[in-house]
Amino acid sequence: MINFKKQIMKKTTFFLCAMLLVSSILIAPRSSLAYPFWAQQNYESPREATGKIVCANCHLAQMPTIAEVPQAVGADSVFKAVVKIPYKDDIKEIGADGSEVPLQVGAVVMLPDGFKLAPQERWTDEIKEETEGVYFTNYSEEKENIIIVGPLPGDTNKEIIFPVLSPNPATNKEYHYGKYSLHIGGNRGRGQVYPTGDKSNNVIFTSSSAGTINSIETIEDGSYQINIENENGEITTEAVPVGPKLIVKEQDQITVGAPLTSDPNVGGFGQLDAEVVLQSPYRIIGLIAFFIGVGLTQILLVLKKKQVEKVQAAEGI
């Protein structure tokens, strides 16, 4: 009887936890499912064949992203890939509920095959301090060379440090020394389009028809319905969600594609490529040996020249 009660309690607890998880997913506003999770859910790879990172499909505005990586790294070594996501301080954007919220940022770093996020036991104290509060995830279980971060509070994360571990060709013959490319993307703010193709409330809304604005209705949740009457007396209704500010009024004459709202977007996405050389230790040793050889040759030439000068002086030449 006691075991039966325990089983009932376990099943009840599991059921409640499952319901809580499902409810949190369904009830959570769309902004909580922001970059980069939708990219993971909708694209096998974050980079298209054209070279475009898929985040640009939803984040239509372009803004700069800066990356700093070492020119060369050694095998089986930890180095920092720094992604900078600049924007003006104290900027706020429109949240999914129409309220003003601080900007969030995110980044994706596509490393060459064999490179991956360095294990935490190999992080230096400096890296641990610089990455405090930052949670790194792989794009998928099969792609550990693709690291994503975000969304994070933008005010304190305009510079994101990625600790990267390089491969060792000496122990894994799949990898080789040489030059490799990295593909990097950085985003600030919400997107303008959802992966479903629907507009978010972080974009300009335009008219799909020409005519006169017959009426503007304010809905209980703060959104609008704009009724446009064309020259034939037909009414087209444009729905504007809560957030964007209307720039039209009743009796305004508008054309197809005319803006109905201001542009609320203050963010944007940017991508770039970088290069890093996986340096062979034998090449470094060879380079050092070459410089030593050149130095010794120069010294021998100077000594030989002085010897010749002494002989010439002795012979009175």
UniProtKB/Swiss-Prot annotation:
PANTHER family in alphabetical order: CYTOCHROME F, PTHR33288
Cofactor note: Binds 1 heme group covalently.
Pfam families: Apocytochr_F_C, Apocytochr_F_N
NCBIfam families, alphabetized: PRK02693.1
Transmembrane segments: 284-304
Topological relation to the membrane, as annotated: Single-pass membrane protein
The protein's role, per its UniProt record: Component of the cytochrome b6-f complex, which mediates electron transfer between photosystem II (PSII) and photosystem I (PSI), cyclic electron flow around PSI, and state transitions.
Binding-site residues, heme: 35, 55, 58-59
Protein name, entry field: Cytochrome f
Subcellular location: Cellular thylakoid membrane
Biological process, per Gene Ontology: photosynthesis
GO cellular component: plasma membrane-derived thylakoid membrane
Subunit details: The 4 large subunits of the cytochrome b6-f complex are cytochrome b6, subunit IV (17 kDa polypeptide, PetD), cytochrome f and the Rieske protein, while the 4 small subunits are PetG, PetL, PetM and PetN. The complex functions as a dimer.
Predominant location: membrane
Cofactor(s) named in the record: heme
Top-level taxon of the source organism: Bacteria
Similarity comment: family membership: Belongs to the cytochrome f family.
Keywords on record: Electron transport, Heme, Iron, Membrane, Metal-binding, Photosynthesis, Signal, Thylakoid, Transmembrane, Transmembrane helix, Transport
Signal peptide extent: 1-34
GO MF assignments: electron transfer activity; heme binding; iron ion binding
